[in-house]
Amino acid sequence: MSSPRYESLAAIPSYSNTFIGRGHHIHAIHTRLQQADTRLITLLGPGGIGKTRLALRMAEEVQALFRDGILFVPLDAVEEADLLSFYIAQQLNMKSQKQEDWLQAVILSLQEKELLLVLDNLEQIIQSAIQIDQILKHCPKVRILVTSRIVLDLSYEIEYPLDGLSRPNANLFPGPIDLLKFDAIRLFVQKAQASKPSFSLTEANAPHVVQICQKLDGLP
């Protein structure tokens, strides 16, 4: 059976604002992806913690490591586990196949590829782990980066739990310049300036900003 035809990989979604924080995770995951035995990495955490944004930042960071690039597959609208292969095929711009052939078609397309497959919001269809297992078994140069609220429970899965961004102690109020050392504060200022460019961190508003970041537990 010949490999299905596909066009160039879909572009990685991008953001106009600067990525803030997660330096430790970026370094650790980058190092992991340079190791030959790393096949599957899962970014774990509750909704809103920043898993998707970190996955996209990682995709940009490690793009040069993969001869055939990055394939980003958003799964937030998918409700049936059987459709995982179909959505991967869509991002590959593959031509139509019979529904029962999608997994095999994806494997045939990727088996000689050296790429990073990013599966975003996999908790929607966590039962699709068996398909991921098959892709990894038959596509030896494919690595997979998953974002999920739930582990896949595969033997070679490497988990990276995410928590809130760094923030100051609620009882301590250093000056505005020192506060900007904390990722949650820097992100708050960035978002505030996006809607009100004149906003700046001052002695007057700093306690309120710290309080907000604490109440949000450092969530982006």
Q: Model regions: which residues?
A:
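Aliphatic-rich helical/repeat scaffold segments used for oligomerization and domain docking
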Residues: M1-P220
